[in-house]
């Protein structure tokens, strides 16, 4: 398993998964190298998207594994590789988030992430269950 920085060749795959992104956003992923495709046996199996908060904290704001590749440890491996990449770039801590009704929070805690807050977007254009944030010192 490996993760590779998103290129223009990955656009159809990434945009079929991430419904939050438009053409401008995708071009930004490529330009800033803030997106990764997760590969297993020469197949695209998922994506990771991150941004850098306050110029010094990588925040993984999207992780998705295709249904047929779930429960095989790919998300765990991808997160560990991503963390190592962020550490190699000199970052000291990472953030991850997920909705309170999603199971990913259990994986994040198993990987050493600590709950550090949440956001509620009730009665806004972004209405959703609470978003829980996790931090990890690298």
Annotate each predicted stretch with a short phrase:
Residues 39-41, 135-138:
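Active-site beta-strand termini and strand-to-loop segments that position acidic
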Residues 5-62, 66, 79, 121:
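Acetyl-CoA-dependent GNAT
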Residues 75, 79, 101-104, 121-127:
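Short glycine/proline-centered loop/turn elements that form peptide/ligand docking sites
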Residues 60, 82-86, 104:
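Short hydrophobic clusters on alpha-helical segments that form packing/core surfaces
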Residues 65, 71-84, 110:
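Conserved acetyl-CoA-binding loop-helix of GNAT-fold acetyltransferases
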Residues 95-97, 114-131:
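Conserved catalytic-core motifs of GNAT/GCN5-like acyltransferases
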């Amino acid at each position: 398993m490996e993760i590779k920085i998103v290129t223009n060749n990955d656009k159809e795959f990434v945009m079929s998964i991430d419904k939050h992104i438009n053409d401008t956003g995708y071009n930004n992923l490529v330009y800033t190298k803030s997106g990764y495709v997760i590969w297993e046996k020469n197949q695209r199996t998922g994506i990771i998207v991150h941004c850098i908060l306050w110029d010094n904290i990588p925040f993984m704001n999207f992780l998705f594994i295709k249904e047929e590749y779930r429960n095989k440890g790919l998300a765990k491996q991808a997160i560990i590789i991503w963390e190592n990449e962020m550490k190699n770039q000199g970052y000291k801590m990472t953030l991850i988030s997920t909705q309170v009704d999603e199971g990913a929070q259990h994986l994040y805690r198993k990987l050493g992430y600590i709950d550090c807050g949440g956001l509620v977007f009730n009665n806004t254009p972004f209405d959703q269950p609470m978003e829980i944030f996790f931090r990890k010192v690298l």
